[in-house]
Every structure is written in structure tokens, then in C-alpha cells.
């Protein structure tokens, strides 16, 4: 960041030497008062933006770490997929066994009638 030459206080306390046929001191003071207000406003805005920048950079670092952790986790993903497939196969076999027995019983009962 560029170094500032003046602070609002420096501008406020600046004394000009009066010269013959120079500028009206009241006009100069009025103008400098407005410059001071603008300068203070810019300083506050700059500080707020710096704080926001720091907060956002910290958030980016945090999210980058989360992505890095997520990138290492997929190695455990196939294990859970295999486990899910195993569960689905077992469930299918169980359904075939239970519902197949019921179908056999229903067919036997229909032949008896």
C-alpha cells in the first residue's frame, strides 16, 4: 500500500503563512475542513475494506483446508460403496427367500381348493 503523506490531524493543524494579497484564510480553512472530512471517510472505508479482505482470506484458507480434507477422503468412499452393495445383495436374497416362500404357499393352497 502507498505511504500516506498526511493524516486528517496533519491537515487540520497545518498553518499557512499569510502573505500580502494571498488567499482568504476563511476560504482555505473551509476547503481544508472538507478535505479533512473526506480524508477521514476514506481512511474508515480503507480500514473496513482491509478488515473484510482479511476475513475473506481467512475464509478462503478454511475452505481450502476443507477441500484438501475432502480430497483425501474419497479413498474411504469405495469401502462404503462395497458395503452398500453387500447390503443390497443380502436384502435381495432375503426378499427372494421370504416372498418366494409365500408364493409357494399360495400356490399350494390354490391347488388344494
UniProtKB/Swiss-Prot annotation:
Oligomer status and interactors: Forms polymers through the coiled coil domains. Interacts with PBP1, MreC and EzrA.
Function summary: Divisome component that associates with the complex late in its assembly, after the Z-ring is formed, and is dependent on DivIC and PBP2B for its recruitment to the divisome. Together with EzrA, is a key component of the system that regulates PBP1 localization during cell cycle progression. Its main role could be the removal of PBP1 from the cell pole after pole maturation is completed. Also contributes to the recruitment of PBP1 to the division complex. Not essential for septum formation.
Family: Belongs to the GpsB family.
Name of the protein in its database record: Cell cycle protein GpsB
Coiled-coil annotated spans: 32-71
Organism: Lactiplantibacillus plantarum (strain ATCC BAA-793 / NCIMB 8826 / WCFS1) (Lactobacillus plantarum)
Keywords on record: Cell cycle, Cell division, Cell shape, Coiled coil, Cytoplasm
Classification via Gene3D superfamilies: 6.10.250.660
Amino acid at each position: 500500500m502507498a505511504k500516506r503523506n498526511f493524516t486528517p490531524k496533519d491537515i487540520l493543524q497545518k498553518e499557512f503563512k499569510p502573505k500580502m494579497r494571498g488567499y482568504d484564510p476563511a476560504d482555505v480553512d473551509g476547503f481544508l475542513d472538507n478535505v479533512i472530512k473526506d480524508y477521514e471517510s476514506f481512511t474508515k472505508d480503507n480500514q473496513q475494506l482491509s478488515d473484510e479482505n482479511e476475513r475473506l482470506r481467512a475464509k478462503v484458507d478454511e475452505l481450502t483446508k476443507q477441500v484438501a480434507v475432502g480430497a483425501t477422503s474419497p479413498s474411504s468412499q469405495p469401502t462404503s460403496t462395497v458395503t452398500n452393495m453387500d447390503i443390497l445383495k443380502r436384502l435381495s436374497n432375503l426378499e427372494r427367500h421370504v416372498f418366494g416362500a409365500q408364493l409357494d404357499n399360495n400356490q399350494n393352497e390354490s391347488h388344494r381348493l
